[in-house]
Amino acid sequence: MKNIRNFSIIAHIDHGKSTLSDRIIQICGGLSDREMAAQVLDSMDLERERGITIKAQSVTLDYKASDGETYQLNFIDTPGHVDFSYEVSRSLAACEGALLVVDAGQGVEAQTLANCYTAMEMDLEVVPVLNKIDLPAADPERVADEIEDIVGIDAHDAVRCSAKTGVGVPDVLERLVRDIPPPEGDPDAPLQALIIDSWFDNYLGVVSLVRIKNGTMRKGDKIKVMSTGQVYNADRLGIFTPKQVDRTELKCGEVGWLVCAIKDILGAPVGDTLTAARNPADKALPGFKKVKPQVYAGLFPVSSDDYENFRDALGKLSLNDASLFYEPESSTALGFGFRCGFLGLLHMEIIQERLEREYDLDLITTAPTVVYEVETTSKEVIYVDSPSKLPPLNNIQELREPIAECHMLLPQEFLGNVITLCIEKRGVQTNMVYHGKQVALTYEIPMAEVVLDFFDRLKSTSRGYASLDYNFKRFQASNMVRVDVLINGERVDALALITHNDNAPYRGRELVEKMKELIPRQQFDIAIQAAIGNHIIARSTVKQLRKNVLAKCYGGDVSRKKKLLQKQKEGKKRMKQVGNVELPQEAFLAILHVGKDGK
């Protein structure tokens, strides 16, 4: 046990986590040179295309240190994006230490800070590493000062390396072995194993990634899931050397994978404790806090025949992604589908892309909304995650919207632009601190505004230098209204949106104009209106297509022309009574972009 080191790598997006892990695998000989690929741990196609890490991956390597001992390194590569911070906290729960990788050119960013604090709260040993020292722009001294100033850990003897060229990576490993403590635990106590992650394999059923805290897990043992009391047989277990390798047992302190032929997706929830059926442990390990979705959107299959497949796909995906929430929903305009909860817009995009790719589905997404707290006139408090569930205006005593606390780190020269953006998003400044050339800003901004497009706009006003970390703070009373869209007098539930009273006329007008461009012309007039309650705030009309019925009258009497026009008018009127309007898919997506281009 004293030779085991469990650690994970935390860093901001693009500071070189995945490249560093490639180097570590190479030095320890986890893969032969032929199998080595760049970013070997980003196994999903989507991860490679976008160049981001989405899922945490684990690897077990043997490293022969300079003191002659051979150490077993279990390391977990974690995502750096704000939407996936829960993946990071899960990975950290399985470790005793963390490598804090900071780009020697860019310096400390918001995500570095957030993940580092998470690690410190869990009492992990944080080892700072300055990466990318081969870059001409690298300034390791300045960055070391920044780490001390902003994060508050001693960084002057931090390891300097370049993951791309491989310089200094052996020093990183030596420092790891020296500074990170070995796991604590009793190999003879009853088995306790924490499920860090699980995913669905078409051949094996549910595969779980586990960290053995106490005791030993052997192949063929009867294993009990503590929350459900179900007993399973440990069919296969082993480690990743990125490849799956079978073992006969996992010892105390190790991280490995386990297959017990669980076919039911809910069989082994993430954060649960496994123990031996014969000699069970008294209590479960502390798990993870459940992450609450921040953004909700309706997902509907384009053809209703796909509904069953869609449901299965969501089930399998939610096993692999513990923070995905879903419940059935039906809409008059779109048929049957699911209301899904996500951690942020990137998470929503990724899930939608994974569903379309891995499970071959075509989906329509409605506009994302956040959760509102509504106090009705009968003093009852309800939570509303979709505009169509909002009670009528006269039944609402008070509507409270979620406020997010946003921590931003940015270079001084962009301060003005960023503050302007925050004010436009109805933000309230709570703190501002200067660290050298960087400014740390704290704002309280309504979650709805953060979720919409705040991140993109923040990046563009600061030329990509600002970084953001946000978390839910509280609910606050606010003057929010629901804007409905009526087409020929009928409400279309999927197009409703909840917005602030001050922006409502503007958003309504913009939405109506967008719809006018997208709805194809029909044989009769289509009236598109935006309304708050019964009060219409905007209207536009898609003009009808009409035939020129007077073309065949050369001269002729005026009463003849009148008769033909009258006849056409009556026909159009009849058409309008029976006609219905088909809404194209683009119309639903238009809501997502309201308020993006205009401003």
From Swiss-Prot:
Catalytic activity: GTP + H2O = GDP + phosphate + H(+)
Primary site of residence: membrane
Coiled coil: none
Membrane-topology descriptor: Peripheral membrane protein
Top-tier EC class: hydrolase
Residues reported to bind GTP: D14, H15, G16, K17, S18, T19, N131, K132, I133, D134
tr-type G domain ranges (all copies): 2-184
GO molecular function, one term: GTP binding
InterPro entries named in the record: EF-4 (IPR006297), EFG_III/V (IPR035647), EFG_V-like (IPR000640), EFTu-like_2 (IPR004161), G_TR_CS (IPR031157), LepA_C_sf (IPR038363), LepA_CTD (IPR013842), LepA_IV (IPR035654)
Gene3D superfamilies to which the protein is assigned, alphabetical: 3.30.70.240, Elongation factor 4, C-terminal domain, Elongation Factor G (Translational Gtpase), domain 3, P-loop containing nucleotide triphosphate hydrolases, Translation factors
A GO-annotated cellular component: plasma membrane
Compartment annotation: Cell inner membrane
Listed EC numbers: 3.6.5.n1
Intrachain disulfide bonds: none
GO biological process, one term: positive regulation of translation
Keyword tags: Cell inner membrane, Cell membrane, GTP-binding, Hydrolase, Membrane, Nucleotide-binding, Protein biosynthesis
Function as written in the Swiss-Prot or TrEMBL entry: Required for accurate and efficient protein synthesis under certain stress conditions. May act as a fidelity factor of the translation reaction, by catalyzing a one-codon backward translocation of tRNAs on improperly translocated ribosomes. Back-translocation proceeds from a post-translocation (POST) complex to a pre-translocation (PRE) complex, thus giving elongation factor G a second chance to translocate the tRNAs correctly. Binds to ribosomes in a GTP-dependent manner.
Family in the record: Belongs to the TRAFAC class translation factor GTPase superfamily. Classic translation factor GTPase family. LepA subfamily.
Protein's UniProt name: Elongation factor 4
Native organism: Klebsiella pneumoniae (strain 342)
